[in-house]
């Protein structure tokens, strides 16, 4: 039996969307295509530059931190104070779900870390010294969210421009039910990306796929 043009067109449209989703590196069409990037605008991949190199090193550091946390958890290695603190945050967060989980991690890490000048360091180093700047807070939250079970494709690091202070800043964006929530060391309030557009201009996006620049 032949199909109607409407049904054929609908299936073709679904096929095109699926192909586009695959090209974008998404895990499936359930991640809404118009909203796969926090703060909305399209982004352009960065193939080279300081941040690309930094992020490559940070991803390697996250793997090392993950192995160190696992060793502390299962192998009984000494000097695990930082890992134990991080694991407590993660386990307590797992008592919650969805927005409540990411809100817990945002608040817990904001309270555990003291504001201080900092650099790009791994999550365990952040918890070892318990201080750092927005990068340290963001890396620690990004790592904790992944360990708490949030899929990598639903996490982003976003470098933004704070319009009020005329300075660059880093936050974490976490997607829950197709809504991007912003984890920010400047506030305990968990607001959405759209609620932050008056305050922040997005500049760069960092995730498992690499570095992208907002157009």
Give a label for each model feature.
Residues 2, 9-18, 25-215:
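A structural boundary/capping signal
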